[in-house]
């Protein structure tokens, strides 16, 4: 059985980028179709899955979806085929709302220098647009997501408007750690975050569950299902469980159709005057490269041979310890404050900028209260002594984490592996990734700062974790640029090769930065929406 669907705009993917584009275009009374590979998520059922799960990791609320698989914690190669010197751990959720279901909610803008790495520091590459051009869309994105913050906190990105809602207050943990930072040449500031400090946009105020990763149980933290629903209310049509596997072009180099599979074995196709790919930085290049035919021998949108290259994941490293005095983690959102310094400066010509933040979730899922209890039980503690010992340890648990930016490297790439397929016969992604010396040098300096912080807190049981690619960021692979010989999309996110194809999401980033990328993804999507409306208005 096969179905054929038509719309003004066909959007593949319903994460934050696809959802915002769908919302903006549906509000403009355009006929919008959203094709999402995964299912809808019911928040209550997800919460029940999390409670019932033995391991409380970020996969716990979201059972595997055989027809739309992803890499999962501690089982990265069940889907990815990693072939490089470093394990690529960037993951995502294939479901309505995408990975924003389990993001931390941190919503910083990129800094002006993040858009001009080559011009400012002689490394990487410049973006085809600058901060000033994106600033109005940052304002719009903050209103759309409901970003809580304070204009008085300087995060290095000039702004004219205030945040739409007041900042999330710092935790007691933030205040204790912040008190020791001054003599170390550091200062703490409250993060802007897409989490309600007050009721906003029909969503409740944060109640401090400390479970933002993997799930906000009440919907106070923004996730993209918010704008999928708004798009549907404005007339958009959502087709969940529709796995797009091929893009078809016509003789005029326009996208004529996309083809999809369903888990029941049925097939479908969809045609739109404009097609928008918003399926993240792994699935999007995989789809483009799988769509080779006699007209596009290297794949769709790939005349530059750049599709799949320049894969980036921010690089993480953390330190844990037990502070001398109680700091009472496990209260409030998972992250509320971060260190201002070391994110930008002339040093970026030699090593990465560093984003350092404090975690409010103790030692996390693997080493938190449950693991502490098991360890103490093995030491023959029972009853009140066991209870007191668990409390003593958990109220002192601290993790400080730092993030480094890699430089874009053509050798870091993703391709479809034609020899290994998923449950419905689609090639799995084969990934080559290497952590570069630029990021390593930045994190080496960051670990010295971690040591100083834990020393000032008179901490014990201090341990530094290995350097790893972030599980929360997947960037590059269809990067934007003015030169069509070295990029896939232009400054408006329109494919150089196909006038009616737009690509939105982190895959268009030329460089990674150290700030969380979600707000920049949102701003770029809103900017592209305006261009799509203009293009449609000019079409016959």
Please report, for each region that a protein language model flagged, where it lies by residue:
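A short, basic/flexible loop-to-alpha-helix module at the beginning of a structural domain
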Residues: 1-6
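FAD cofactor-binding and catalytic pocket of flavoenzymes
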Residues: 76-92, 96-99, 103, 127-131, ...
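Conserved redox-cofactor binding core of oxidoreductases
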Residues: 58-73, 79-85, 94, 109, ...
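A conserved FAD-binding loop/helix module that cradles the flavin
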Residues: 511-530
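N-terminal Rossmann-like FAD-binding beta1-loop-alpha1 element of flavoenzymes
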Residues: 9-34
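A glycine-rich dinucleotide-binding beta-alpha-beta segment and adjacent secondary-structure elements
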Residues: 76, 189-215, 219, 245-248, ...
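Glycine-rich loop(s) and the adjacent beta-strand/alpha-helix scaffold that form part
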Residues: 27, 31-53, 233, 242, ...
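Conserved N-terminal glycine-rich FAD pyrophosphate-binding loop of Rossmann-like flavoproteins
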Residues: 39-65, 93-102
């Amino acid at each position: 059985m096969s179905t054929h669907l038509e719309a003004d705009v066909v959007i593949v993917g319903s994460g934050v980028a696809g959802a915002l584009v769908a919302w903006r275009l549906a509000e403009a009374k355009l006929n919008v179709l959203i094709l999402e590979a995964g299912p809808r998520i019911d928040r209550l059922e997800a919460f029940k899955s999390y409670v019932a799960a033995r391991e409380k990791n970020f996969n716990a609320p979201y059972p595997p979806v055989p027809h739309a698989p992803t890499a999962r914690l501690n089982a990265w190669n069940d889907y990815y085929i990693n072939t490089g010197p470093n394990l690529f751990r960037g993951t995502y959720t294939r479901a309505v709302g995408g990975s924003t279901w389990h993001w931390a909610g941190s919503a910083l803008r990129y800094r002006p220098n993040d858009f001009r790495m080559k011009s400012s520091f002689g490394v990487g590459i410049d973006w085809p647009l600058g901060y000033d051009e994106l600033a109005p869309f940052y304002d719009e994105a903050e209103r759309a997501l409901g970003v809580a913050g304070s204009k008085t906190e300087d995060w290095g990105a000039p702004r004219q408007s205030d945040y739409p809602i007041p900042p999330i207050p710092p935790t007691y943990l933030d205040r204790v750690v912040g008190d020791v930072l001054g003599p170390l040449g550091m200062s703490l500031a409250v993060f802007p975050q897409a989490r309600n400090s007050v009721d906003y946009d029909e969503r409740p105020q944060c109640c401090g569950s400390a479970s933002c990763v993997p799930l906000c149980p009440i919907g106070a933290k923004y996730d993209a299902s918010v704008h999928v629903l708004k798009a549907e209310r404005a007339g958009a049509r959502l087709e969940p469980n529709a796995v797009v596997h091929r893009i078809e072009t016509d003789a005029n180099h326009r996208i004529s159709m996309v083809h999809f599979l369903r888990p029941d074995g049925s097939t479908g196709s969809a045609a739109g005057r404009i097609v928008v790919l918003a399926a993240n930085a792994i699935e999007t290049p995989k789809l483009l490269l799988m769509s080779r035919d006699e007209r596009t021998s290297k794949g769709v949108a790939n005349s530059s041979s750049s599709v799949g290259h320049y894969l980036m994941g921010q690089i993480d490293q953390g330190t844990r310890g037990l502070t001398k005095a109680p700091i009472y983690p496990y209260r409030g959102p998972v992250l509320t404050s971060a260190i201002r310094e070391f994110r930008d400066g002339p040093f970026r010509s030699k090593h990465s900028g560093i984003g350092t933040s404090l975690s409010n979730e103790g030692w996390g899922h693997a080493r938190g209260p449950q693991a502490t209890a098991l360890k103490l039980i093995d030491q023959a503690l029972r009853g009140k002594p066991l209870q007191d010992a668990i409390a003593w340890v958990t109220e002192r648990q601290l993790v400080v984490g730092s993030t480094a930016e890699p430089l874009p490297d053509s050798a870091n790439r993703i391709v479809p592996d034609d020899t290994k397929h998923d449950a419905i016969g689609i090639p799995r992604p084969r990934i080559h990734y290497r952590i570069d010396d630029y990021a390593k040098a930045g994190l080496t300096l960051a670990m010295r700062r971690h040591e100083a912080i834990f020393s000032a807190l008179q901490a014990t049981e201090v341990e530094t974790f290995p350097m790893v690619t972030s599980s929360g960021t997947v960037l590059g692979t269809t990067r934007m640029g003015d030169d069509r010989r070295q990029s896939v999309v232009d400054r408006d996110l329109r494919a150089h090769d196909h006038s009616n194809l737009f690509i939105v999401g982190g895959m268009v980033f030329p460089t990674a930065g150290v700030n969380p990328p979600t707000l920049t993804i949102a701003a770029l999507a809103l900017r592209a929406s305006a261009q799509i409306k203009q293009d449609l208005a000019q079409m016959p």
